[in-house]
C-alpha cells in the first residue's frame, strides 16, 4: 500500500516523517541523519547532488550549487546551468525527490502522497509554487499546512484534555512566523498569524560574513567578498560559528589559505564573542518583535493568557532569541519538542488525519494576508481580511467606472496597504461582454474562495447577463500544466540517470576491491598455486586495473570483473587442493600433535579456512 508522509521543506534543512503505529516518526536519510540540508548542486559530469553531499562540495563548485532556494519560491527567479534553466520549483523538487526516495527505502514501499509545510506568512504564489514542486517530484500534495500549525499539532495532540492558548515562535533559516492557537477537544484553531518571509538564520550568518570580510580587509587590504570560493568558505564558517556561540561564550574562526597576497598565502584567524555577535545582530532580533505584537493585537489577547510557548526552527537555539521570547511572552518556552523535527512530525500527523488514521482532530488555519482587488484610483478594496479562518468564501458587488464600459479587468492583490501599488499582485483576468450602460449601473459580483491549502480562486459574474469568468490565482511565477508535466518527466529522467550513475560507481568500486582482494590472496598463497593457474589470474588482475583507468566503459569493466572472478575460482580450487594434499602427506604429524596435546602440551594451532565459494563472489 502506498504511504503518505509529512515533509518540512525548509530553507536550510528539510525533514520527512511518517506515522508508524499511530506515532509520528522522523525518517533518517540515506546518510543516517534525521535532517537533510536543502542544498542542490550540479556537477560538471551532469550529475545532480542533493543534501549533505551537495553541501560538502559547495566550496569548489560555487556557481553550480544552490542553497536557500525557499527564499525564491513564488518569484521569477531562475538559475542557469549549462544549457538548462531551473526555476525554484524544480530546485525544490530535487530536494523533495531525495526525501521521497529515502522514505521509500526506509519504509520498503512506494511513497505517493505528502503533506508539505510552508511558513504561515507565505503568499498565495509561494504556496502554489510549493505545491508545484511536490507535483514535479512525483508527489500528490494532499495539503499545504502552515509550519506553526503543524508544530502545534505535534505538541498538542496528546494534550487536548484541557483548553490551551499556545504561541508558536518559528524562526527558521530564511523565514519567521508567529502564530497564536487555541487547542480544545481536538480542535486546533489558529487565532492570528504574522511574520517576515525575509528574516531567518541566513541573515545572522550574513552578519558574521560581513564582519569577517571587514576584519580581513582592514588587516590585509583584500576584499574577500569579491572571491566566490572564499565567500563560500566564509558562509560555512559563519554558520558553524553561530551554532558554536549558542553553547560557548566565544569561538575561533580559522580559515587557512583563504586567499593569496603579494607575499604569499594569507590565512584568516578571528575570535568572535557571543556579546559581539549579539551586538552586530541586534537589529535582526528587534525585527522579531513586530510580528509578535501584531499577533497579540489581532487575537485580542494579552501575554498573561498564553499557556505555552513553542520554539520552532534551528535559529531559536540562539540564546538571544530564547531570551527575547521569554521577555515577550513572559514565560520560559516549552522544552519538550525538537525545533528541527517538530514541523515534519506535525505534517505526518495531518497526513494521518487526511487518511483517516488519526481521529477526532480538526485543524482550523487562517489566511495570513488580506485579499482584495484594485478599484478606481488604485485603491486596495479588501474582500477577505487577514486572519480569516480557511477554507472560506466571500463576495462583493462592484460596478463600472466609465460609461458604456465593455469589460472590466479584475486585478487581484494580497497585502495590508491601502493602495495596490504597495501590495503583492497575484494576477488578473478580464470579464468581457458587458451590456452598454452608464457607469455605476452594471453589477459585477466578485467572489474570493480560499481552499484548505490557502490557495486562492477568484470568480467574477455580470449579474445582468449571467456572463462569468473565473481563475485560480497563481501569480506570475506559477507554472502551467504542460510545463509541470514536462518538469515531472525531466525529474523522472534525471532520477533514472542518477540511479544508473550510482550503480556504475558502485560497480567500479566493487571491481577495485575485487582486484585488491585477489592480488592479496595470490601473494599470500603464491607457493600453493601452479604457474599455469597463477599466470591467467595475474593477467586478469592487470586487465581489470587497466580497464578501471578508463571512463564510460562500464560494460568493459563488468566483463573484466567476470573474467577475473572465473580465474580466481580456479585459483581457490588450487589452494584448497594444496591444503588437502599437505594434510594427506602428513597424517602422523597430526597424531603426534594429538598425543602431545593429550600429554598436557597446551600448544594451540591456528588454522585458516579458505572458503572457495567466497572466492567466487
From Swiss-Prot:
Entry's induction text: By stress conditions e.g. heat shock.
Compositionally biased region (Acidic residues): 599-617
Entry keyword annotation includes rRNA processing: no
Residues modified to Phosphothreonine: 175
Swiss-Prot/TrEMBL keywords: ATP-binding, Chaperone, Nucleotide-binding, Phosphoprotein, Stress response
Endpoints of the signal sequence: none
Record region (Disordered): 578-617
Composition-biased stretches (Low complexity): 578-598
InterPro entries in alphabetical order: ATPase_NBD, Chaperone_DnaK, Heat_shock_70_CS, HSP70_C_sf, HSP70_peptide-bd_sf, Hsp_70_fam
GO terms assigned for molecular function: ATP binding; ATP-dependent protein folding chaperone; unfolded protein binding
Pfam family, one: HSP70
Chain's role: Acts as a chaperone.
Similarity annotation: Belongs to the heat shock protein 70 family.
NCBIfam families: PRK00290.1, prok_dnaK
Record-given protein name: Chaperone protein DnaK
